[in-house]
């Protein structure tokens, strides 16, 4: 017996901005953005603010990264599709 899939609310406008920044950075530079660069771009006072956005995006399978490794934050296919308007998010 499978449990019913719980539908998540849409991502917040700020989460969409962070996702877009990650995707644009990767497309423009050919390598992944760092947590510090996200903090600087969004003027987050604490690195924890970026981490909270990243974790929320990862729970929705919109970004991925390798913990403990530098420059591994990237959008997933689902994240790219959401930004292209092919998904509700």
Residue spans of the language-model regions?
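Short, Lys/Arg-enriched N-terminal segment that forms or immediately precedes the first helix
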Residues: 1-10
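Pre-recognition alpha-helix immediately N-terminal to the DNA-recognition helix
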Residues: 17-24
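Helix-turn-helix DNA-binding helix
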Residues: 18, 49-50
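Alpha-helical DNA-recognition elements
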Residues: 24, 55-56
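Short helix-capping/hinge SLiMs at alpha-helix to coil transitions
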Residues: 24-30
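A short alpha-helical element within helix-turn-helix/winged-helix DNA-binding domains
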Residues: 32-41
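A short, conserved structural fragment
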Residues: 58-68
